[in-house]
Regions:
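A detector for short, charged/polar N-terminal pre-domain segments
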Residues: 1-9
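N-terminal helix-turn-helix DNA-binding core of bacterial DNA-binding proteins
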Residues: 11-53, 82
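Basic, amphipathic "hinge/linker" alpha-helix immediately C-terminal to the N-terminal HTH DNA-binding motif
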Residues: 21, 73-96
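Glycine-centered, phosphate/nucleic-acid-interacting loop/turn motifs that mediate DNA/RNA or nucleotide
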Residues: 24, 65-66
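Basic amphipathic alpha-helical segments that dock to polyanions
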Residues: 54-64
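Short beta-strand "wing" residues that participate in macromolecule-binding interfaces
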Residues: 69
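Amphipathic alpha-helical dimerization/coiled-coil segments
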Residues: 91-116
Length: 116
């Protein structure tokens, strides 16, 4: 069931943070960029959220049309996830966060490499 979230303001920064600003959503999007596409791959990634939170974040990303479900590419009836155009449009945001972290947070290293 879809919950209609009330906007706290018309500010695009506030609205974007309402959708993306929790602890896990951008990590899930990053992992999709890194090629993880199935729930089990996302759930076993080094920085994965608990599975109940992963399910909730994926549902929110599906609802907001940043991610879509597709058939798994292994011929099974399992489903996979991929970023939509809207989700891929977050690439510069992830790159900016990566670059900022590399510059200002000691002992960080990129997982994204040339992927984004």
């Amino acid at each position: 069931m879809s919950k209609k979230r009330k906007k706290r303001s018309p500010c695009p920064v506030a609205c974007s943070l309402d959708l993306l600003g929790d602890k896990w959503t951008l990590i899930v999007i990053r992992d999709l960029y890194l090629g993880r596409s199935r729930f089990t791959e996302l759930a076993t990634a080094p920085e994965s959220p608990p599975t109940n939170i992963l399910t909730e974040r994926l549902n929110r990303l599906l609802e907001s049309k940043m991610v879509r479900q597709i058939p798994a590419n292994d011929g099974t009836k399992h489903r996979a996830y991929e970023l939509t155009e809207k989700g891929r449009a977050l690439r510069p945001v992830l790159e900016a966060l990566r670059d900022w972290g590399l510059k200002w947070i000691p002992n960080t290293q990129t997982l994204l490499g040339k992927v984004i």
